[in-house]
């Protein structure tokens, strides 16, 4: 859902950035100074406090940001925003991205245009609600791991370069047996990330759908499937596998799953509230990031 919102201004702004990304400390420092000049209260997430001089500012652990802030601004690339989403979504804290990465599908504002933030803080912006996935790895009756993903839940080969055999069920109905290098279960947000390189479709962010994208399937007729996002997906790892594959959520964590285990994926109960400038246009972003500009229609 994308809507233009006019509401009371954001006054308490938390800043977050990823260490080791070029230009992030400089942009964080400039952003801090700009926000102070706008008479906003600035809160630093603990890692951000290590990158800039925040001696006069409140420093807060990532999991406590909602108690002190009403907006989280992330400086970095899409990977930085993914990391921030894992922190902000359970707290239901809105997120705005400043792009210091390469693609920037999720981080809208260039570092040399920080003045765009002023209108957003005054309550003039577009708010986009994007859903996440929740993945659960089970072996027998034991829950081995559980996590959320803004982009994707991915079944990956184990340490040996071998195909994985697995069964796919949707809402407890058997779909197919597959032998492939893995499977990507992607949200619309993730459809322009790893799943795109695997031949998956681009899903508009407002679609309440997810796609199942096989990775290098043994059968040429295996193709991506788009399903209702309210579905529950179950992947059962065949007991015949002689290696243990991995399950990853947004590339953040990787968990081994034994043959015979199950991976359950469903829609997470909290969404991401992503903030954009009022002139944000999804198709403009696609044209720029996927190099469609040369074929842009003349209006």
From Swiss-Prot:
List, separated by semicolons, the cofactors it needs.
Answer: a divalent metal cation
- The regions listed as transmembrane in this protein's record are none
Q: Which UniProt keywords apply?
A: ATP-binding, Cytoplasm, Kinase, NAD, NADP, Nucleotide-binding, Transferase
Q: Where does NAD(+) bind?
A: 78-79, 151-152, 162, 179, 181, 192-197, 252
Q: Which reaction does it catalyse?
A: NAD(+) + ATP = ADP + NADP(+) + H(+)
Catalytic residues at 78
Say which family it is in.
Belongs to the NAD kinase family.
**Function description:** Involved in the regulation of the intracellular balance of NAD and NADP, and is a key enzyme in the biosynthesis of NADP. Catalyzes specifically the phosphorylation on 2'-hydroxyl of the adenosine moiety of NAD to yield NADP.
List the protein's name.
Answer: NAD kinase
Look up and give the organism this protein is from: Coxiella burnetii (strain RSA 331 / Henzerling II)
Give the encoding gene's name. nadK
